[in-house]
């Protein structure tokens, strides 16, 4: 068995880490998320304390996002201006999240806090996504019944339209995303996602992508690339802060990263082949 001791009394099979890295890399490529919402629980199941699982997952997602965003930038799916605004806000939230996790660790509540917040957020995001998909399906069915022409895109939700109508200066136009909105609203979204990311050890993609689509109202393919772009900055900061607290196992993160990077490089080669 290819096991190595990551902690006293904790041995992890290297093939399990490779499998986790490959699986998370595939999810990252398809859904535009960092993949750490899979990595963090998996590391906890393998026996790592929650604080180490969180820090190590952020180290992995930093490298994974750098490789993934290269592909999306090549495809033109990155709104740089929006991504930088989200990144600055997410970094501020990340600091708050790291402090919350350190407090929970000192109180002996890290496992309960990380797992309970992760489960709650997955339920909330999943439920809202299903409700919104159902609403759009009903809207399309009505248009088909009336034989109306279907729109080429339906990115704007009722909630995103209300948020875009809030006039808090300065109002910025994001040409790539096709929206005009106050950066303060976007910063609030970034701060909230960054705080959660710092606590539960994710890049925030599984929350950020639905937020960009349903709250901000940008196309899903732009949301995917832009989220991966901002994750590079926010996850890097979170990784450094967790490393300062001794919460990062670099060998574990590197093993998973090698597997996920191989998957991303395979996708890039397919993209290059399809464009020639």
Task: Spell out what each predicted region is.
Residues 1-20, 74-192, 214, 244-276:
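Juxtamembrane transmembrane-helix boundary motif
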Residues 17-21, 59-62, 189, 229:
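Alpha-helical transmembrane segments of multi-pass membrane proteins
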Residues 21, 25-33, 37, 64-69, ...:
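Transmembrane alpha-helical segments of multi-pass membrane transport proteins and ion-pumping complexes
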Residues 25-26, 42-45, 69-70, 194-195, ...:
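Alpha-helical transmembrane segments of multipass membrane proteins
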Residues 36-83:
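Juxtamembrane transmembrane-helix termini in multi-pass membrane transport proteins
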Residues 39-52, 207-222:
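Interfacial segments of multi-pass membrane proteins
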Residues 57-61, 227-231, 253-257:
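Short hydrophobic/aromatic, small-residue-rich stretches within specific transmembrane helices
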Residues 64-75, 233-249:
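Membrane-interface helix-cap regions at the ends of transmembrane helices
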